[in-house]
Swiss-Prot record:
The gene is psbN. Coiled coil: none annotated. May play a role in photosystem I and II biogenesis. GO terms for biological process: photosynthesis. It is a single-pass membrane protein. This is Protein PsbN.
C-alpha cells in the first residue's frame, strides 16, 4: 500500500476510537461519576 493510504487509515481509526471512547464516557458506565453543575446550583 502507499504511505498516504496507511496514514489516512490510521488517522481515521484514531478518530473513530476517540469518538467511541468519548461517547462511552459521556453516556456509558463512567457517566454515573460525572457531576452536574446545573444540578448543584440551586436558585
Amino acid at each position: 500500500m502507499e504511505t498516504a493510504t496507511l496514514v489516512x487509515i490510521s488517522i481515521s481509526g484514531s478518530l473513530v476510537s476517540f469518538t467511541g471512547y468519548a461517547l462511552y464516557t459521556a453516556f456509558g458506565q463512567p457517566s454515573q461519576q460525572l457531576r452536574d453543575p446545573f444540578e448543584e446550583h440551586g436558585d
